Amino acid sequence: MKATLCTWLPAAARKQKGFDYMNKKNAVLSPLAGGKLGKVKEIWSRNSLYSTLFALVVMVLIQAVVQGLNNGSFFGMFGGLGRAWMNILRNNVYAGIIALGMCFIIISGGIDLSVGSMLCALGGALMYLLDEKAGPLAAIGITGAPAYAISVVVIILMGCLMGALNGGLIAYGKLPPFIATLGTMKIFRSVTQQMTKTFNPEVPAGFKQIASFKIGGQVILPIIYWILIVALMYVIFKKTAFGRQTIAIGSNEKAAKLSGINVPAVKLKIYALGGIMTAIGAIIYISRIGSMDFANAGSGYEMDAIAAVVVGGTSMAGGKGNVFGAFIGMLIIGVMNNILNTIGVPTFLCEAVKGLIIIFAVLLQKKDSN
């Protein structure tokens, strides 16, 4: 059995069960451990966060060279660097917040393909609640800040329930995560499109200030929200029993169950947390943009989130990952998009590059499961 499967157990228990991961005699080496590829994989596996940071630095250097060759602004003007990074951060806030929830899901050994469609559905529901002409809150005389607060709470609860639906299908319905979330992805998108055929709400100007208010001439509130949520999710992952249980389930679900963890309940909470993160992304999206194309909004966010999590060092096999790594991974994806757009690469080829990055990252982290 892999030495790292039970690292969440006390040291004495690991030694008793023969899982002492500090004992090299018990270590299981991959058949591909030899050679240059094996060395790269070993370095990536043991220092995934440092590897991710190094990859970000390399991407930034490439970005600097590309933009410098393109218009000279990156090296010649400090403002060029600032503008480029502000755009990268702003453009990736929504998928970046979703990636934080996706990180927990993938560490637990699951996946959620429905988050893009979920964001679209939640965005539509939020716009309906906020509409001061035909919305339900305006109909009963609730407008302004009270309406904003109620709408935000309702959308977060809806996101929690939608995520819990995925978790329930997986944990209690025993459906594979891929199948369950593929089904809900189609359901969420289809229902939203059907319900918004004659939908033309207006987002109040006051609500737009939640994410569009300028500080120093720049729209940075969404970035601040993102960083604060990263810090919160990091604390939840590193300092709470819930975070340890997530790792335990992803490492070895049977062992986690035998140790007393209520696996179905924890899985339900994990997917509910993913739904909450998607709801927050939808709230910031509507506040920042003020409108939504219900046919395409959120499309591809699931792939961006998965790519960020995997590039950030989280194992697709579960049991290993880092919330901060998911944040860095999303920055890498954002810088890559900026580079490709700068050199004029078509959008469909950009998506192909993302796919190659996911495959390469998984190949680097892949190990023998025996």
Task: State each model region's role.
Residues 7, 12, 16-97, 135-148:
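Membrane-interfacial amphipathic/re-entrant helices at transmembrane-helix boundaries
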Residues 173, 177-239, 266-269, 288-299:
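Transmembrane helix-bundle core of multi-pass membrane transporters
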Residues 148-153, 162-166, 218-293:
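Helix-loop-helix "hairpin" substructures at the membrane interface of multi-pass membrane proteins
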Residues 278, 289, 293-355:
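Transmembrane alpha-helical segments in multi-pass inner-membrane proteins
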Residues 63-67, 81-133, 169-174, 313-323, ...:
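Single transmembrane alpha-helix segments in multi-pass membrane proteins
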Residues 134-184, 328-329:
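Alpha-helical transmembrane segments within multi-pass membrane transporters and channels
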Residues 52-65, 102-103, 156-159, 185-190, ...:
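Hydrophobic core segments of alpha-helical transmembrane domains in multi-pass membrane transport
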Residues 69-90, 192-193, 199, 217, ...:
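Inter-helical junctions in multi-pass inner-membrane proteins, predominant
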